[in-house]
Curated annotation (Swiss-Prot):
The lineage of its organism: Eukaryota, Metazoa, Ecdysozoa, Arthropoda, Hexapoda. Residues 1-20 form the signal peptide. The keyword RNA-binding does not apply. It comes from Phlebotomus duboscqi. This is Salivary protein 15a. Pfam families: PBP_GOBP. GO terms for molecular function: molecular sequestering activity; odorant binding; toxin activity.
């Protein structure tokens, strides 16, 4: 009888943990079958990761979070932190400028363009980048 409460609480947490999804799973489920919005898949995941905000903005806090993940997962050496943040700031400015030029404001395409810009930097290797994002994705429950 003493352990009944503990067993029930443990069961509730176990059930909750089993039902938890990663951002990738959640976003893929959200956009499954919706070909018009499939371009928003990256934005959905990056929003859960904290790399881009709900309104497609890429501010200092989002850049800090993204750069920390890339350094923590070994994509970029920590000694190149300043260079990485500079690249990310430049990419953020570039995608905002492109959005204004194309007579649309920030949208899902902005997220994809930002991702591409950061990924094509000489500091980042695509294979390490993808693995780091996949590994980071597994650490988040939605």
């Amino acid at each position: 009888m003493k352990y009944l409460g503990l067993a029930l609480i443990s069961a509730v947490f176990l059930i909750g943990a089993c039902q938890a999804e990663t951002p990738s799973q959640k976003c893929e489920e959200k956009y499954k079958g919706n070909t018009d919005k499939i371009s928003c898949l990256h934005h959905c995941k990056y929003q859960y990761y904290g790399f881009i905000d709900v309104n497609y903005n890429i501010a200092q806090s989002e850049i800090r979070k993204f750069s920390n993940v890339l350094m923590d997962y070994g994509v970029v050496d920590k000694s190149k932190k300043r260079e990485l943040k500079k690249v990310m700031h430049e990419c953020a400015k570039q995608v905002k400028k492109e959005a204004r030029k194309d007579s649309h404001w920030l949208n899902c395409r902005t997220s994809i363009n930002y991702y591409r810009c950061v990924l094509t930097s000489k500091l980042i290797g695509p294979q390490r980048f993808d693995k780091a994002i996949q590994d980071y994705d597994k650490t988040i429950s939605v």
